Amino acid sequence: MNTVNVSRRRLLQASAVTGGGLVVGFAITGCSSTPVPLPVASTEGAWTPNAFLQILPDNTIRFYTARSEMGQGVTTGLATLVGEELDVNPLHMDIRLAGVHEDYVNPLFGMQGTGGSSSIRAHYMQLRQVGANTRGLILEAAAQDLGVSASALSTDNGFVVHGDKRYPYAAFVETAQSLSIEVDAPLKPASQFQYIGQETKRVDAIAKATGTAQFGIDVDIPDMHYAVVVRAPVARAKAQSVNAADAKAMPGVIHVFEM
Protein backbone atom coordinates (compact mmCIF):
# COMPACT_ATOMS: atom_id res chain seq x y z
CA MET A 1 0.00 0.00 0.00
CA ASN A 2 1.25 3.50 -0.84
CA THR A 3 0.41 6.04 1.84
CA VAL A 4 1.59 9.42 2.99
CA ASN A 5 0.61 11.74 5.78
CA VAL A 6 -2.10 14.35 5.44
CA SER A 7 -2.05 17.41 7.66
CA ARG A 8 -4.66 17.94 10.35
CA ARG A 9 -5.62 21.19 8.62
CA ARG A 10 -6.19 19.42 5.30
CA LEU A 11 -8.24 16.71 6.97
CA LEU A 12 -10.41 19.33 8.67
CA GLN A 13 -10.88 21.12 5.36
CA ALA A 14 -12.03 17.91 3.76
CA SER A 15 -14.35 17.22 6.67
CA ALA A 16 -15.85 20.68 6.30
CA VAL A 17 -16.64 19.98 2.66
CA THR A 18 -18.78 17.04 3.71
CA GLY A 19 -20.93 19.21 5.94
CA GLY A 20 -20.38 16.95 8.91
CA GLY A 21 -20.81 13.76 6.89
CA LEU A 22 -18.53 10.77 6.88
CA VAL A 23 -15.31 10.76 4.91
CA VAL A 24 -13.79 7.36 4.26
CA GLY A 25 -10.49 7.17 2.44
CA PHE A 26 -6.74 7.40 2.27
CA ALA A 27 -4.43 10.39 1.93
CA ILE A 28 -2.17 10.19 -1.08
CA THR A 29 0.09 12.55 -2.94
CA GLY A 30 0.86 13.58 -6.47
CA CYS A 31 4.20 15.09 -5.53
CA SER A 32 6.33 11.98 -5.71
CA SER A 33 8.96 11.99 -8.45
CA THR A 34 8.68 8.21 -8.76
CA PRO A 35 5.59 6.94 -10.61
CA VAL A 36 3.51 4.62 -8.45
CA PRO A 37 2.33 1.44 -10.20
CA LEU A 38 -1.42 1.22 -10.66
CA PRO A 39 -2.99 -1.02 -7.99
CA VAL A 40 -4.93 -3.15 -10.47
CA ALA A 41 -5.15 -6.88 -11.01
CA SER A 42 -2.38 -8.41 -13.09
CA THR A 43 -4.10 -10.43 -15.79
CA GLU A 44 -2.16 -11.87 -18.72
CA GLY A 45 -3.19 -10.26 -21.98
CA ALA A 46 -5.26 -7.55 -20.31
CA TRP A 47 -5.05 -3.95 -21.50
CA THR A 48 -5.01 -1.25 -18.84
CA PRO A 49 -5.32 2.09 -20.69
CA ASN A 50 -5.75 4.09 -17.47
CA ALA A 51 -6.29 3.70 -13.74
CA PHE A 52 -9.98 2.95 -14.11
CA LEU A 53 -10.38 0.43 -16.91
CA GLN A 54 -9.07 -2.94 -18.01
CA ILE A 55 -10.12 -4.96 -21.02
CA LEU A 56 -9.44 -8.67 -20.61
CA PRO A 57 -8.78 -11.20 -23.40
CA ASP A 58 -12.31 -12.61 -23.03
CA ASN A 59 -13.69 -9.07 -23.53
CA THR A 60 -14.55 -8.60 -19.88
CA ILE A 61 -14.66 -4.86 -19.19
CA ARG A 62 -13.29 -4.26 -15.71
CA PHE A 63 -13.97 -0.93 -13.98
CA TYR A 64 -12.08 0.14 -10.86
CA THR A 65 -14.16 2.47 -8.73
CA ALA A 66 -12.28 4.66 -6.27
CA ARG A 67 -15.29 5.56 -4.13
CA SER A 68 -16.74 3.49 -1.32
CA GLU A 69 -20.25 2.10 -1.64
CA MET A 70 -22.14 2.92 1.55
CA GLY A 71 -25.66 2.38 0.27
CA GLN A 72 -25.79 5.61 -1.72
CA GLY A 73 -25.53 3.89 -5.10
CA VAL A 74 -22.21 5.44 -6.03
CA THR A 75 -20.88 2.23 -7.58
CA THR A 76 -23.75 2.20 -10.06
CA GLY A 77 -23.46 5.94 -10.65
CA LEU A 78 -19.75 5.98 -11.45
CA ALA A 79 -19.94 2.86 -13.62
CA THR A 80 -22.75 4.55 -15.52
CA LEU A 81 -20.56 7.56 -16.31
CA VAL A 82 -17.70 5.57 -17.78
CA GLY A 83 -20.03 3.04 -19.42
CA GLU A 84 -21.96 5.76 -21.21
CA GLU A 85 -18.95 7.01 -23.13
CA LEU A 86 -17.24 3.62 -23.45
CA ASP A 87 -20.50 2.23 -24.83
CA VAL A 88 -20.71 -0.65 -22.37
CA ASN A 89 -23.73 -1.46 -20.23
CA PRO A 90 -22.70 -0.91 -16.57
CA LEU A 91 -24.54 -4.12 -15.64
CA HIS A 92 -22.13 -6.05 -17.87
CA MET A 93 -18.97 -4.69 -16.22
CA ASP A 94 -16.74 -6.44 -13.72
CA ILE A 95 -16.59 -3.73 -11.06
CA ARG A 96 -13.87 -3.73 -8.42
CA LEU A 97 -12.85 -1.38 -5.62
CA ALA A 98 -9.68 0.48 -6.51
CA GLY A 99 -6.55 0.55 -4.38
CA VAL A 100 -4.59 3.63 -3.33
CA HIS A 101 -3.15 5.81 -6.09
CA GLU A 102 -2.83 9.48 -6.96
CA ASP A 103 -5.12 9.01 -9.97
CA TYR A 104 -7.96 8.27 -7.56
CA VAL A 105 -7.76 11.55 -5.62
CA ASN A 106 -11.10 13.24 -4.98
CA PRO A 107 -10.37 16.76 -6.32
CA LEU A 108 -12.76 18.33 -3.82
CA PHE A 109 -10.81 16.89 -0.88
CA GLY A 110 -7.29 16.75 -2.26
CA MET A 111 -7.08 13.14 -1.07
CA GLN A 112 -8.66 9.79 -1.83
CA GLY A 113 -11.95 9.65 0.02
CA THR A 114 -15.72 9.27 -0.19
CA GLY A 115 -18.14 11.69 1.40
CA GLY A 116 -20.14 14.87 1.16
CA SER A 117 -22.23 13.67 -1.78
CA SER A 118 -19.17 14.53 -3.88
CA SER A 119 -18.54 11.45 -6.02
CA ILE A 120 -20.70 12.25 -9.03
CA ARG A 121 -20.09 16.00 -9.09
CA ALA A 122 -16.35 15.53 -8.63
CA HIS A 123 -15.93 12.82 -11.28
CA TYR A 124 -18.77 13.40 -13.75
CA MET A 125 -16.60 14.81 -16.51
CA GLN A 126 -13.47 12.84 -15.58
CA LEU A 127 -14.99 9.38 -15.88
CA ARG A 128 -16.95 10.25 -18.98
CA GLN A 129 -13.69 11.37 -20.58
CA VAL A 130 -11.97 8.16 -19.44
CA GLY A 131 -14.64 6.16 -21.24
CA ALA A 132 -14.61 8.33 -24.35
CA ASN A 133 -10.83 8.27 -24.71
CA THR A 134 -10.67 4.50 -24.26
CA ARG A 135 -13.38 3.99 -26.86
CA GLY A 136 -11.53 6.36 -29.18
CA LEU A 137 -8.35 4.30 -28.93
CA ILE A 138 -10.28 1.10 -29.62
CA LEU A 139 -11.89 2.61 -32.72
CA GLU A 140 -8.54 3.88 -33.98
CA ALA A 141 -6.98 0.46 -33.41
CA ALA A 142 -9.90 -1.27 -35.12
CA ALA A 143 -9.61 1.04 -38.11
CA GLN A 144 -5.94 0.13 -38.48
CA ASP A 145 -6.49 -3.60 -38.05
CA LEU A 146 -9.47 -3.75 -40.40
CA GLY A 147 -8.01 -1.36 -42.95
CA VAL A 148 -11.00 0.97 -42.93
CA SER A 149 -11.76 4.51 -41.86
CA ALA A 150 -12.71 5.00 -38.22
CA SER A 151 -15.77 6.88 -39.45
CA ALA A 152 -17.02 3.60 -40.96
CA LEU A 153 -17.09 1.99 -37.51
CA SER A 154 -19.46 2.22 -34.58
CA THR A 155 -19.66 0.56 -31.18
CA ASP A 156 -22.33 -1.36 -29.34
CA ASN A 157 -22.01 -2.62 -25.78
CA GLY A 158 -18.36 -3.66 -25.91
CA PHE A 159 -18.21 -4.50 -29.61
CA VAL A 160 -16.93 -2.64 -32.66
CA VAL A 161 -19.43 -2.80 -35.50
CA HIS A 162 -18.46 -2.70 -39.19
CA GLY A 163 -21.31 -3.40 -41.55
CA ASP A 164 -22.91 -6.65 -40.45
CA LYS A 165 -19.85 -7.79 -38.48
CA ARG A 166 -19.20 -7.35 -34.77
CA TYR A 167 -15.78 -7.53 -33.15
CA PRO A 168 -15.15 -7.57 -29.37
CA TYR A 169 -13.14 -4.66 -28.02
CA ALA A 170 -10.52 -7.19 -26.88
CA ALA A 171 -9.75 -8.06 -30.50
CA PHE A 172 -8.02 -4.70 -30.93
CA VAL A 173 -6.18 -4.44 -27.63
CA GLU A 174 -2.77 -5.33 -29.04
CA THR A 175 -2.88 -2.45 -31.52
CA ALA A 176 -4.54 -0.07 -29.06
CA GLN A 177 -1.64 -0.50 -26.63
CA SER A 178 0.70 1.12 -29.14
CA LEU A 179 -1.51 4.18 -29.57
CA SER A 180 -1.69 7.34 -27.50
CA ILE A 181 -4.28 10.04 -26.97
CA GLU A 182 -3.28 13.34 -28.56
CA VAL A 183 -6.61 15.12 -28.07
CA ASP A 184 -9.50 14.14 -25.80
CA ALA A 185 -12.25 12.32 -27.64
CA PRO A 186 -15.55 14.21 -27.96
CA LEU A 187 -18.24 13.43 -25.40
CA LYS A 188 -21.79 12.42 -26.28
CA PRO A 189 -24.51 15.07 -26.29
CA ALA A 190 -27.16 14.43 -23.64
CA SER A 191 -29.66 13.58 -26.38
CA GLN A 192 -27.67 10.40 -27.10
CA PHE A 193 -27.41 9.12 -23.52
CA GLN A 194 -28.32 5.45 -23.12
CA TYR A 195 -27.52 5.09 -19.42
CA ILE A 196 -26.97 8.48 -17.77
CA GLY A 197 -30.27 9.80 -16.48
CA GLN A 198 -32.09 6.58 -17.33
CA GLU A 199 -33.75 4.21 -14.90
CA THR A 200 -31.48 1.23 -14.34
CA LYS A 201 -30.83 -1.60 -11.94
CA ARG A 202 -28.17 -1.33 -9.26
CA VAL A 203 -24.98 -3.08 -10.36
CA ASP A 204 -24.55 -4.57 -6.88
CA ALA A 205 -28.17 -5.57 -6.27
CA ILE A 206 -27.75 -9.29 -7.00
CA ALA A 207 -24.61 -9.61 -4.86
CA LYS A 208 -26.34 -7.93 -1.93
CA ALA A 209 -29.49 -10.00 -2.35
CA THR A 210 -27.53 -13.25 -2.43
CA GLY A 211 -25.13 -12.34 0.36
CA THR A 212 -22.06 -12.54 -1.85
CA ALA A 213 -21.19 -8.83 -1.66
CA GLN A 214 -17.97 -8.17 0.24
CA PHE A 215 -17.73 -5.44 2.88
CA GLY A 216 -15.04 -4.28 5.26
CA ILE A 217 -16.35 -6.55 7.99
CA ASP A 218 -15.78 -9.53 5.67
CA VAL A 219 -12.03 -8.96 5.44
CA ASP A 220 -10.02 -11.86 6.81
CA ILE A 221 -6.24 -12.04 6.55
CA PRO A 222 -3.72 -14.32 8.29
CA ASP A 223 -3.03 -13.43 11.95
CA MET A 224 -5.64 -10.68 11.91
CA HIS A 225 -6.90 -9.44 15.29
CA TYR A 226 -9.98 -7.44 16.23
CA ALA A 227 -10.06 -4.29 18.33
CA VAL A 228 -13.02 -3.01 20.33
CA VAL A 229 -13.37 0.55 21.59
CA VAL A 230 -14.78 0.87 25.10
CA ARG A 231 -16.52 4.23 25.17
CA ALA A 232 -17.31 6.47 28.11
CA PRO A 233 -20.89 6.28 29.41
CA VAL A 234 -21.46 10.01 28.86
CA ALA A 235 -20.37 12.47 26.19
CA ARG A 236 -16.95 14.13 26.59
CA ALA A 237 -16.02 12.01 29.57
CA LYS A 238 -12.39 10.92 29.89
CA ALA A 239 -10.93 7.97 31.73
CA GLN A 240 -9.15 9.01 34.91
CA SER A 241 -7.36 5.69 35.20
CA VAL A 242 -7.36 2.30 33.54
CA ASN A 243 -6.84 -1.04 35.25
CA ALA A 244 -6.35 -3.42 32.37
CA ALA A 245 -5.30 -6.43 34.43
CA ASP A 246 -8.75 -8.06 34.48
CA ALA A 247 -9.27 -7.49 30.76
CA LYS A 248 -5.84 -8.88 29.86
CA ALA A 249 -6.60 -11.98 31.90
CA MET A 250 -9.58 -12.79 29.67
CA PRO A 251 -9.08 -15.52 27.04
CA GLY A 252 -8.12 -14.11 23.66
CA VAL A 253 -7.20 -10.62 24.85
CA ILE A 254 -3.79 -9.64 23.49
CA HIS A 255 -3.40 -6.06 24.64
CA VAL A 256 -5.25 -3.14 26.20
CA PHE A 257 -4.20 0.45 25.61
CA GLU A 258 -5.58 3.93 26.13
CA MET A 259 -6.54 6.21 23.26
What is the predicted function of each stretch?
Residues 2-28, 32-259:
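Cofactor-binding beta-sheet edge motifs in enzyme active sites
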